[in-house]
């Protein structure tokens, strides 16, 4: 089996996690108490969904996941919520005091005390796997726990499980909507370790997803639940091929191979289509070509970043539902002819396609319409550097005055770490710039397309 362990860190990671597991349970017909009426083999069968769920002798399905937070309130909601019987109590780890939006507290003082317990639980889950494939790590980097404890955990996972791939789903601060003054500090300190210790990081940002909810789903005032359910659809599409059987299945390591041209250039944009409310879907014909086009629409990107300002290095298209390879190839051929969608000249093919026959599932009472087919696109584009330069600018404004720095130093950080992380990000922006530059040899061949 190719098992995957999910790790949800901090409030953002846990709430996205709740939405994901809710959706996975619906997709597999697993009830909130972990029973699965359709599963006839008691004990660990070799079913595809066993990559995400382990089975007990009593026929109960338990997610291979750990939830951790430095303060109890968010995890207590899981402990008392609808799915309280789904998780083993040991999988829900919470501390007593929170990180107070401070990376240093999450990474050094308070995180240090809890991280060994977390690794111990992760070790137990890993021992329960026959062939662990890797980790999915969910966190947001604006706060203290997701950024500090999240990066501490990634560093320790690299030591303990060096060769296993780590995919991060990371919620980055939005350009306009802010939840903390020190977001730029936390996210840059955290990205510094995401650079080294994740293999692929999918960037999400709340503002972009708010706008999608408003525009496509007519939700006037989207809540975090609306946002998280949308994120859950993306994550579900990415992992569908691990959990179901299909024509072109995609492994976690395959993402890496196809999307990451250089180790540092691994921050991905994602989009999902069709995002449409039930009232509208009734009147629309959502063909493969249409959903493929909307996946490339800048407005449908899940991070505030315009892919028209950069070039694509690689795209991975994960289709699910009623889709055949012939339609996909035709749609992609059309995309390639469009002048607005540019690829770097050193990567002529640029597409990785996965097809899974399991149609998308929607949460009852949710916002999304039930559709026959959907696509999720994960793309590596040089435009993502916009996100970093925006954060770097905000970081510089504050750091020039050393504002708020004493809170970090007081928790045992050194001021040098700020400049080190900032330099690392400056280098990253430079890397993205260089990747997008035309290669010298390519200049004479422009006409030959």
Swiss-Prot record:
Swiss-Prot/TrEMBL catalytic activity: GTP + H2O = GDP + phosphate + H(+)
PTM comment: Undergoes a tyrosination/detyrosination cycle, the cyclic removal and re-addition of a C-terminal tyrosine residue by the enzymes tubulin tyrosine carboxypeptidase (TTCP) and tubulin tyrosine ligase (TTL), respectively.
Keywords annotated in UniProt: Acetylation, Cytoplasm, Cytoskeleton, GTP-binding, Hydrolase, Magnesium, Metal-binding, Microtubule, Nucleotide-binding
Binding site for GTP: 11, 71, 140, 144-145, 179, 206, 228
Its EC number(s): 3.6.5.-
GO molecular function: GTP binding; hydrolase activity; metal ion binding; structural constituent of cytoskeleton
The protein's enzyme class: hydrolase
Main location: cytoplasm
UniProt binding sites for Mg(2+): 71
UniProt superkingdom: Eukaryota
SMART domains listed in its UniProt record: Tubulin, Tubulin_C
Assembly and interaction partners: Dimer of alpha and beta chains. A typical microtubule is a hollow water-filled tube with an outer diameter of 25 nm and an inner diameter of 15 nM. Alpha-beta heterodimers associate head-to-tail to form protofilaments running lengthwise along the microtubule wall with the beta-tubulin subunit facing the microtubule plus end conferring a structural polarity. Microtubules usually have 13 protofilaments but different protofilament numbers can be found in some organisms and specialized cells.
Protein name in UniProt: Tubulin alpha chain
Originating organism: Tetrahymena thermophila
